[in-house]
C-alpha cells in the first residue's frame, strides 16, 4: 500500500478552529520504522489548555441540551466518516505507531467506527425511571452530563483508544479536551480534520505536546469535572491524585502482566495461535498482553519446541507492507528498555529460547524492530514475570495443577486481562472466575469488541470502558421529588 499523505504541520484544534500554539512552538513526530520525520505538531502551553477548556464549557451550554436522536446522528455520521477513510487512517496509524497495516485495517480503524455506532444505539435505548413513593409522592430519576472532561490517550492504540473515550463522551452530552500522546498524535489530528464539520465547535478539542508539561496542565486544570486516562500505572497514580485533590472522578485503564494459561487438553492449533496473538499483537505493546505464559507440565516440552518454531517464522517488517506480521516498537527508548529486560531475565536464570535481539538487517536497519522473544526456565517471582515489559517478550512458566496456576496467576500487582485454554468448560469457568482480573478470555485472546466491559482491578485501573456502563461515569444521577398532595403539611402554624 502507498503511504498516507500528511500535512507538513498540524495545529491545535480548539473551539472548532485550527490554531497555532500560543508560544508558536512545535515538535516533530517520527516514524519508528525508518526514523523519518512525518510532521510537525503544535506544542501546547498552559494558555492553550485554558482556551480549550473555556471553549468546551461554552459549547456545553448548548450540547448538553441536544436530544438523544441528535447525538446519535452525530455518532453514526462519525462512524460513516471513519469507514469512508479507513485506508487513509489505517496507514497514518501504521506510519506513526509502527504497527502492521494488516492490524490497523482489521482492528484499530473498523473497531473504532463500531464503537461510535454502539454508543449511538445505547443512548437511544436508555430510559430514566419514575417511582411512586406513596399516594402523594413521585420520584423521578434522571441522568445528566457531568460537564467538561479531560481525556489523555496512550501511544499504543492512539486511534482506537480515542474512540473508546470520545464516543461515550459525545453520547452522554459532555464536552472534552483531548490530549494525544506526544509520540503518536497524527491519527487523532487527521480524525479531527475529517469530523470538524460534524461535531459542533468546542465539543471536541485536541491538545498536543511533546513533553509532560501539556499533560500536567490538564491534570492541574480546575475546569474539568472528570478525568479519563489510559497508560502506565505510574502516571495513572498521578492522574488519580489530581482527580482526588479536585474531588472529581477518574477512569483509569493502566498496566498489566496478564496470565495466558494453557492446560494439557487445549486445542493445539488454537493454543499456538493464542500464544502469538497474546504477546505479538501490536509488537506486545498491549496493556493486557499475555506476557506470563503458564503451561501445564505434561505438555511443556512440546509446547516450547513448537512455540519457538512459530516465533522464528514470524515476518518482522516495515509496517506499511501487507505481508508484515510484526512491525516496529514505538521508539528506540522502548526498544532498549525491552532488551534490558531480556538481560535482566538472563541474570535471574531465565533462558532465551528465541529472539531477544534487535532486527536490523536490510530495510529494518533504521527502525526499532525486535525479534519475537520467548524466555524459558522462568519462575513467577522473577522481575521479568512481575514487571510490565511492554514488548514481544513472553515468559513461559511451568505448572502442575489448577490450584497451583491460579495461585501464581494471582501473585501479581496487576489484574487487567488473561486467558485459559482448555476443552473442559467447567475448568474454563473455574479458572476464569478464579483469576483476579477484569477480563478473562476462554480459548481466545485480545478480542476487544464493543459491548463488552473492559478494565482492570488492583494496579491495572479503575472503571470499565467499551460498554454502556461507561455512560454512568460521564453522567450524574439527579432525583426530582414531586409532592402531589394538595394541602399543607400542617407541620407549622397556618
Q: PLM features: residue spans?
A:
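A short acidic/small-residue loop/turn micro-motif
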Residues: 20-21, 26-27, 43-47, 266
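Short, well-ordered beta-strand elements within core beta-sheets of diverse protein domains
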Residues: 37-44, 59-65, 151, 260-263, ...
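Conserved C-terminal structural/oligomerization subdomain of aldehyde/semialdehyde dehydrogenase
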Residues: 34-39, 261, 315, 342, ...
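Hydrophobic face of amphipathic alpha-helices that form TPR/SEL1-like repeat modules
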Residues: 1-33, 357
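Residue-level signal for inorganic ion chemistry
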Residues: 35, 71, 93, 116, ...
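Glycine-rich loop-to-alpha-helix module at the N-terminal edge of alpha/beta enzyme cores
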Residues: 36-126, 136
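ALDH superfamily catalytic-core signature
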Residues: 234-379, 442, 489-493
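Rossmann-like NAD(P) dinucleotide-binding subdomain of oxidoreductase/dehydrogenase enzymes
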Residues: 127-270, 308, 399
Amino acid at each position: 500500500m502507498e503511504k498516507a499523505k500528511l500535512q507538513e504541520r498540524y495545529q491545535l484544534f480548539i473551539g472548532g478552529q485550527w490554531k497555532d500554539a500560543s508560544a508558536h512552538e512545535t515538535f516533530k513526530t517520527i516514524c519508528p520504522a525508518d526514523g523519518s520525520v512525518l510532521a510537525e505538531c503544535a506544542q501546547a502551553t498552559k494558555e492553550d489548555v485554558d482556551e480549550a477548556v473555556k471553549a468546551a464549557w461554552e459549547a456545553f451550554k448548548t450540547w448538553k441540551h441536544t436530544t438523544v436522536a441528535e447525538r446519535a446522528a452525530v455518532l453514526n455520521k462519525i462512524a460513516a466518516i471513519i469507514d469512508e477513510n479507513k485506508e487513509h487512517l489505517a496507514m497514518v496509524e501504521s506510519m506513526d505507531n509502527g504497527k502492521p497495516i494488516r492490524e490497523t485495517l482489521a482492528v484499530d480503524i473498523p473497531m473504532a467506527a463500531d464503537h461510535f455506532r454502539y454508543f449511538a444505539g445505547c443512548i437511544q435505548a436508555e430510559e430514566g425511571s419514575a417511582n411512586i413513593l406513596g399516594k402523594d409522592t413521585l420520584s423521578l430519576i434522571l441522568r445528566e452530563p457531568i460537564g467538561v472532561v479531560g481525556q489523555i490517550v496512550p501511544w499504543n492504540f492512539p486511534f482506537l483508544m480515542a474512540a473508546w473515550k470520545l464516543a461515550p463522551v459525545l453520547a452522554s452530552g459532555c464536552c472534552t479536551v483531548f490530549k494525544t500522546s506526544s509520540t503518536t498524535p497524527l491519527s487523532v489530528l487527521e480524525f479531527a480534520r475529517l469530523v470538524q464539520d460534524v461535531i459542533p465547535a468546542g465539543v471536541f478539542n485536541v491538545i498536543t505536546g511533546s513533553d509532560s508539561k501539556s499533560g500536567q496542565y490538564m491534570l492541574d486544570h480546575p475546569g474539568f469535572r472528570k478525568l479519563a486516562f489510559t497508560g502506565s500505572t505510574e502516571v495513572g497514580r498521578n492522574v488519580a491524585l489530581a482527580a482526588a485533590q479536585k474531588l472529581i472522578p477518574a477512569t483509569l485503564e493502566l498496566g498489566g502482566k496478564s496470565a495466558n494459561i494453557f492446560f494439557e487438553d487445549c486445542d493445539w492449533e488454537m493454543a499456538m495461535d493464542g500464544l502469538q496473538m497474546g504477546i505479538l499483537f501490536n509488537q506486545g505493546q498491549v496493556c493486557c498482553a499475555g506476557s506470563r505464559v503458564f503451561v501445564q507440565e505434561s505438555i511443556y516440552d512440546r509446547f516450547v519446541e513448537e512455540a519457538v518454531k512459530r516465533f522464528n517464522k514470524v515476518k518482522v517488517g516495515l509496517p506499511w507492507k501487507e505481508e508484515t506480521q510484526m512491525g516496529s516498537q514505538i521508539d528506540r527508548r522502548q526498544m532498549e528498555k525491552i532488551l534490558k529486560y531480556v538481560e535482566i531475565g538472563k541474570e535471574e536464570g531465565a533462558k532465551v529460547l528465541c529472539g531477544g535481539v534487535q532486527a536490523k538487517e536490510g530495510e529494518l536497519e533504521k527502525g526499532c524492530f525486535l525479534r519475537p522473544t520467548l524466555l524459558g526456565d522462568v519462575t513467577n517471582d522473577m522481575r521479568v514475570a512481575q514487571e510490565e515489559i511492554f514488548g514481544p517478550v513472553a515468559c513461559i512458566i511451568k505448572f502442575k495443577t489448577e490450584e497451583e496456576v491460579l495461585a501464581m496467576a494471582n501473585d501479581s500487582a496487576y489484574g487487567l486481562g488473561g486467558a485459559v485454554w482448555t476443552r473442559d468448560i467447567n475448568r474454563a469457568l473455574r479458572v476464569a472466575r478464579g483469576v483476579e482480573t477484569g477480563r478473562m478470555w476462554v480459548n481466545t485472546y485480545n478480542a476487544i469488541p464493543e459491548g463488552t466491559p473492559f478494565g482492570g482491578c488492583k494496579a491495572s485501573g479503575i472503571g470499565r470502558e467499551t460498554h454502556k456502563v461507561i455512560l454512568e461515569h460521564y453522567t450524574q444521577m439527579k432525583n426530582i421529588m414531586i409532592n402531589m398532595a394538595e394541602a399543607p403539611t400542617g407541620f407549622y402554624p397556618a
